[in-house]
Structure formats: structure tokens, C-alpha cells
Amino acid sequence: MLLFPGTFTMQTDYAELVRRTIRSVPDWPTPGVTFRDITPVLQDPRTFRVLIDLFVYRYMRQRLDLVAGVDARGFIVGAVLAHELNLGFVPVRKKGKLPYRTVAEEYSLEYGNAAVEMHTDSVRTGQRVLLVDDLIATGGTMLAAIKLLQRLGANVVEAAAIIDLPYLGGSAQITATGTPLYTVCQYQEGD
């Protein structure tokens, strides 16, 4: 059940509630980095409900076929959202975690490479998929997941995240691919 009728002001107020509930942890995992921790949002049933409802309201009329969630925190929101929208959920996992035939997409990290993978039968050609993660920083994981879904024939309708750190450039890279992007909260450098 949606908690709000969907007016812009109410959506903005609810997004601000989510933002205020996210914990900022300075100097973690390394000095100079401020980690944005969504666990307080997940621990508070009202705020978690509001977060999910923000996504449900946005996507309930999009004629989606599936929700894909990026390992690992994208699973939490993505699976709940898929349930609320009465859709299937597809995990986009870190390489080596899925038991069946997989297809992988590599992406660059600051000090090396990583990969995400999906089962080869997880999406069908032409299916309309929403891709969800918790946070967009440099965008590498989300971009790899988009490429992977497209390689399997999916139409990535939109990428969505709870948090965007636009100063790290990931959201700009995602939108540059032509994939629309929705984020609930944005943090600027120094916030």
C-alpha cells in the first residue's frame, strides 16, 4: 500500500526522510572516504516502506517484466521492489557466485578488474528490465550490469539507485549510454 498520493512535494519530503536516515561514516573504508550506510533505512520499517514506495510509485505503470538487482545491497531493495510490483527478480552477481551457465561482464576498479555475471537464461530477448543498486559512485558496476543485460537481449528501461555521488562521475557515464537514471538521494562532495 502506497503511503503517499504522489505529489511532487510529498515525494521530495519522503526522499529527504530517506536521506536523513542514511548514516554517513567518515574515513571508512579508507581515510578521506565517507561511506553512505543504508542499514539505518533498512532497520526502520517506516523509512524502508517509504523508500520502497518511492520506487513503486515511479515504476508501477512502466510495464516492466523484471527487476534486476546488483550484488549485494541492490538485492535487498530490488527483491522487495520486484515483490511489490508482482515481478520476477534477477540477481546480477559477483563472478563465481552463480551455479548454472553464466555470462559475465568485466569492469575496471581503481586497482584492477572485477566482473559481474548472470545466468544465461535469466532474461529473454525484449524483456523490459529495471536495474537497481544501492549506490552509484564511479558507475563501473552499474555500467557492467547494463551491458550484461543488453547482451542477453533485455531492454533496460531505467537504472535506479538509492544514492548518487555525482561528483565521482558514475551517473553521467550511465546517462551517456542512453539509459535513463533515477536516484532518490544525491550527495555532493563534502556533504
Curated annotation (Swiss-Prot):
Cross-referenced SUPFAM superfamilies: PRTase-like (SSF53271)
Recorded GO CC terms: cytoplasm
Protein name: Adenine phosphoribosyltransferase
Name of the gene: apt
Lineage: Bacteria, Pseudomonadati, Pseudomonadota, Betaproteobacteria, Burkholderiales
Subcellular location: Cytoplasm
Family matches, as Pfam families: Pribosyltran (PF00156)
Superkingdom as given in the UniProt entry: Bacteria
Catalytic activity, reaction form: AMP + diphosphate = 5-phospho-alpha-D-ribose 1-diphosphate + adenine
Oligomeric and partner information: Homodimer.
Entry's EC annotation: 2.4.2.7
Pathway this chain belongs to: Purine metabolism; AMP biosynthesis via salvage pathway; AMP from adenine: step 1/1
